């Protein structure tokens, strides 16, 4: 796969963009937004942990840079609901930052993150998965959505 930037680094970059661009957008602060942000963060972490456990249970690689080393197609657990729960978890974490620090800018940067990950991570991963798992992956793609 051509992509060499690990998705957690991409998430960190967009998270920093959300935080440091807050002075360019109107400020919306409230206890409700902070609480929703905390809930979003906990959901994101839970999704990530669940996805990693599913990978480990199938004894396959978690490393998105070396997707070619995948030894099995994970379709159980949280992967029944999303083909990309790791990236979905990262979106929830960015939404947490959005709700807590920068509502308008955060929404923009979270959308940009989703576009970036879709084009530069998910699309190349799915090409590799097609080659590795053929019809099994094609069937999985038909039955489970990309994000949620």
Locate each region found by the language model:
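Membrane-anchoring alpha-helices and their flanking helix-loop junctions
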Residues: 1-76, 88-148
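Generic transmembrane alpha-helix motif of multi-pass integral membrane proteins
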Residues: 78-81
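Extended, alpha-helix-rich binding/interface surfaces that flank or overlap catalytic cores
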Residues: 84
């Amino acid at each position: 796969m051509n992509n060499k930037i690990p998705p957690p680094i991409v998430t960190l970059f967009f998270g920093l963009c959300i935080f440091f661009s807050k002075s360019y957008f109107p400020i919306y602060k409230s206890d409700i937004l902070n609480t929703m942000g905390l809930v979003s963060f906990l959901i994101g972490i839970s999704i990530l942990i669940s996805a990693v456990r599913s990978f480990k249970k199938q004894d396959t690689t978690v490393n998105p840079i070396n997707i070619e080393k995948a030894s099995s197609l994970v379709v159980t657990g949280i992967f029944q609901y999303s083909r990309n729960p790791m990236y979905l978890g990262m979106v929830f974490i960015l939404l947490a930052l959005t709700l807590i620090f920068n509502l308008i800018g955060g929404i923009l940067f979270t959308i940009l993150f989703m576009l970036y990950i879709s084009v530069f991570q998910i699309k190349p991963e799915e090409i590799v998965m097609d080659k590795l798992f053929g019809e099994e992956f094609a069937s999985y793609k038909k039955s489970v959505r990309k994000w949620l």
